[in-house]
């Protein structure tokens, strides 16, 4: 299926049953089968308010009755004129119903027209990073190709399985634009991800600012995965090696996983809250069972040690390693079961100790020492990609190796807040320079 955007139908779309012309007023509805997500469309259907089966963006509560997303059109496509406002980015999301669950190849074409565009960043599904900070010269046209997995999910706060047969594509930037979009079924291996909030696809509010948005590394791992695989993330806040199974999340994976797929396990943070899930007992037993079952399906299990937190003693002079026993348990299981292991615990702890508590806090959600913001998720997923590259002989996940040396981790000594323009014009996806707290605008 192909969608052509803008006021002027393409020559190919005229009279074609396979090309749909999309206009700025086309708001999404399940009956129509495609369209843009706006404040109005989100409020008209309760299912469009469930982050896990949509784009992962919701308006700040004080903007819920506003009209921030107002698509416009010209000969180059459908765009937002107000891609950046004072307090963040405004996303434009196109949503399409697909015929089946499974993996799809997405080809997205963007055209700048007469106006240069800065900071184009592309997400798929529930805020999964696909492309980062592209700047366009006038009349420049670019095509992006990536894979998207469509799968059942149990949303956070829900007990039942939701059947999802939609694809969401979100663009942010100074003037985000859709020109053409092609979605086609694609048979490729799937990388299933399991875990807790440090891994999960987390929602964000808009106006969007990355440092004040929760994000797990699984949400940005898609940026590093090549076009030879697709990612299906089933991590959620609060999950451990026990309730991931008992609440039904693992059943979704068992229903879909096949020979040649991968399944990544990263638990520990929530296991540590229960005595029967101690590192050397219940936690270890549950991981062993997961590994045996995944192998029985012909898939490859992979263990990731728990993310280290920004946890220090009271005067911030000594690091407090709260996850050491669980990281050691993972290493023991890896050696025993001959399972590839990615030691995220060690590499994240080394980074936190190197930069110190204050600077490390810039990569975590404000006031949270364990859950990363979008900058931290980008950083941690990059660490994982680099480690996969290093052990690729035993962990052959198809990644974009050209990106693995470009993980950005230095802390810059900027004493004042960065503006959105400065953030976009920087050479890389830089860490935040200040804590940006979303606040309701004062009425004039």
Show where each model-derived region lies:
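Aromatic/hydrophobic pocket-lining residues that form the small-molecule binding cavity
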Residues: 283, 287, 327, 377
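Substrate-gating cap/lid alpha-helix
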Residues: 311-345
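Conserved SGNH/GDSL esterase-like catalytic core that processes O-acyl groups on lipids
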Residues: 174, 184, 189-193, 198-292, ...
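A short helix->loop->beta-strand "cap" motif at the edges of active sites that frequently abuts
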Residues: 261, 292-300, 339
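Anion (oxyanion) recognition and catalysis
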Residues: 288, 295, 331-335
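Short beta-strand segments at enzyme active-site cores
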Residues: 264-266, 301-305, 341-345
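Conserved catalytic region of serine esterases and O-acyltransferases that act on ester linkages
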Residues: 1-3, 8, 87-89, 357-444
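Compositionally biased, intrinsically disordered or flexible polar/acidic segments
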Residues: 1-205, 213-215, 444
């Amino acid at each position: 299926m192909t969608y052509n955007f803008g006021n002027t139908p393409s020559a190919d779309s005229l009279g074609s049953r396979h090309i749909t012309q999309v206009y700025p007023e086309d708001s999404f509805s399940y009956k129509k089968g495609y369209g843009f997500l706006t404040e109005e469309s989100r409020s008209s259907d309760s299912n469009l308010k469930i982050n896990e089966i949509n784009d992962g963006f919701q308006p700040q509560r004080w903007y819920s009755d506003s009209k921030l997303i107002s698509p416009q059109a010209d000969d180059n496509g459908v765009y937002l004129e107000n891609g950046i406002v004072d307090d963040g980015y405004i996303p434009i999301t196109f949503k399409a119903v697909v015929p089946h669950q499974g993996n799809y190849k997405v080809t997205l074409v963007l055209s700048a027209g007469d106006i240069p565009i800065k900071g184009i960043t592309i997400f798929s599904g529930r805020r999964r990073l696909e492309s980062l900070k592209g700047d366009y010269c006038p009349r420049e046209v670019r095509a992006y190709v990536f894979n998207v997995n469509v799968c059942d999910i149990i949303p956070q706060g829900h007990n039942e399985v939701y059947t999802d047969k939609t694809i969401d594509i979100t663009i942010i930037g100074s003037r985000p634009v859709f020109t053409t979009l092609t979605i086609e079924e694609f048979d490729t291996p799937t990388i299933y991800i399991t875990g807790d909030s440090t891994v999960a696809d987390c929602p964000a509010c808009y106006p969007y600012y990355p440092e004040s948005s929760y994000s797990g590394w699984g949400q940005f791992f898609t940026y590093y995965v090549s076009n030879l695989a697709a990612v299906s993330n089933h991590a959620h806040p609060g999950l451990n090696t026990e309730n991931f199974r008992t609440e039904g999340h693992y059943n979704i994976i068992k229903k879909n996983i096949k020979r040649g797929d991968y399944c990544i396990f990263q638990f520990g943070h929530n296991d540590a809250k229960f005595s029967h899930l101690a590192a050397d007992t219940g936690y270890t037993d549950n991981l062993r069972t997961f590994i045996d079952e995944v192998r029985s399906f012909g898939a490859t299990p992979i263990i990731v040690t728990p993310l280290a937190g920004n946890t220090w003693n009271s005067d911030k002079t000594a690091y407090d390693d709260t996850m050491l026993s669980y990281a050691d348990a993972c290493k023991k299981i890896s050696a025993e079961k001959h399972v590839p292991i990615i030691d995220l615990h060690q590499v994240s702890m080394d980074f936190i100790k190197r930069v110190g508590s204050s600077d490390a806090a810039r990569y975590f959600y404000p006031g949270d020492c364990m859950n990363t913001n979008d900058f931290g998720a980008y950083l941690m997923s990059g660490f994982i990609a680099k480690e996969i590259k290093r052990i690729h002989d035993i962990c052959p996940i198809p990644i974009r190796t050209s990106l693995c040396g470009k993980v950005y981790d230095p802390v810059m000594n900027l004493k004042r807040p960065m503006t959105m323009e400065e953030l976009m014009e920087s050479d890389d996806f830089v860490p935040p320079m200040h804590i940006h707290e979303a606040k309701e605008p004062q009425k004039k």
